[in-house]
């Protein structure tokens, strides 16, 4: 079934997000430990003085890493703009350098998450159009610019990329606060392990919610495009909720309800109705069949027309049942 296959696709991307976030958090903790160790082993130097001394080698390594990230052509313009901030920064002391190193790690982690979400949403649009073509027997040729427009449409006041980078800003501020505690108060990074683990779970949850919810939105946008192109302005669609113990009240309420395609709006009368929404839509069968037979009326003898109607009806039913 289409809903189940899309759920599996979502799960695969969530696993990739979990890996990226785990590596990002591990790098953050590793850098905190490394800086704490350097301060703890500074011989003959007062703690307050040690934290001010910037190792030229550390700066050089950081600049090389920042430059390498900026030159990554896979990242978006927004990601590269964020990364360039670290490539041109000045470093007055160890605390500032540490904050920039951690900020670079966080930014790179979110750039990689953005890539995963972007590719998943584009693939979701393509799969949805292919699925609709299997049901209705008609392809819609969509330009890459149309796919991109669907993927980056606003849902509410912001699009998914803007929401993702807002989440990055929040995590970066939290990490910088931890860095200040390590550098200014000499607190061991181990004290922050519970908080770091909490941030890891929260980061995964935020991106997962964004990915699944936006996947439902682009499915709806792609379905609407296909319905209008193949069935016309008077076409209708049926809201289909995934029925189980997790199904929300609002999706249960809308399940099996029929609406005009021209009035189709995600979050209003089409998925997603809420975060993590798993509902979808299908063309309204009764409406489609009526049009299907009306277009062919009078083209055949009465006897043959009856045979044709039965054959066509059986063919459509099989296609809908099999999800082709």
Can you describe what each PLM-predicted range is?
Residues 199-206:
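Short, basic interhelical loop/turn and adjoining N-cap
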Residues 1-119, 199, 212-324:
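Activation/maturation switch segments at domain boundaries
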């Amino acid at each position: 079934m289409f809903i189940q296959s899309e759920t599996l696709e979502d799960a695969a991307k969530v696993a990739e997000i979990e890996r990226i976030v785990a590596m990002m958090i591990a790098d953050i903790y590793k850098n905190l430990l490394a800086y704490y160790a350097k301060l703890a082993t500074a011989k003959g130097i007062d703690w307050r003085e040690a934290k001010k001394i910037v190792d030229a080698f550390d700066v050089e390594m950081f600049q090389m890493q920042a430059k390498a990230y900026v030159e990554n052509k896979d990242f978006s313009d927004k990601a590269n703009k964020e990364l360039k901030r670290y490539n041109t920064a000045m470093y007055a002391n160890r605390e500032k350098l540490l904050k920039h190193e951690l900020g670079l790690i966080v930014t790179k982690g979110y750039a990689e998450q953005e890539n995963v979400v972007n590719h998943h949403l584009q693939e979701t649009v393509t799969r949805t159009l292919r699925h609709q073509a299997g049901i209705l027997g008609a392809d819609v040729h969509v330009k890459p610019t149309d796919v991109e427009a669907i993927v980056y449409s606003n849902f509410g006041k912001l699009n998914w990329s803007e929401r993702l980078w807002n989440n990055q800003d929040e995590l970066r501020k939290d990490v910088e606060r931890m860095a200040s505690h390590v550098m200014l108060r000499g607190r061991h990074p181990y004290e922050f392990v519970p908080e770091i683990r909490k941030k890891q779970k929260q980061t995964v949850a935020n991106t997962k919610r964004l990915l699944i919810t936006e996947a439902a939105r682009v499915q709806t946008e792609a379905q609407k495009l296909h319905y209008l192109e193949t069935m016309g302005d008077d076409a209708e669609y049926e809201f289909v909720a995934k029925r189980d113990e997790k199904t929300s009240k609002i999706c249960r309420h809308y399940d099996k309800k029929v609406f005009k395609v021209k009035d189709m709006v995600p979050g209003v009368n089409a998925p997603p109705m809420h975060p993590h929404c798993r509902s979808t839509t299908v063309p309204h069968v009764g409406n489609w069949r009526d049009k299907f037979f009306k277009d062919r009326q009078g083209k055949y003898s009465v006897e043959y027309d009856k045979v044709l109607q039965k054959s066509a009806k059986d063919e459509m039913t099989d296609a809908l049942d099999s999800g082709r």
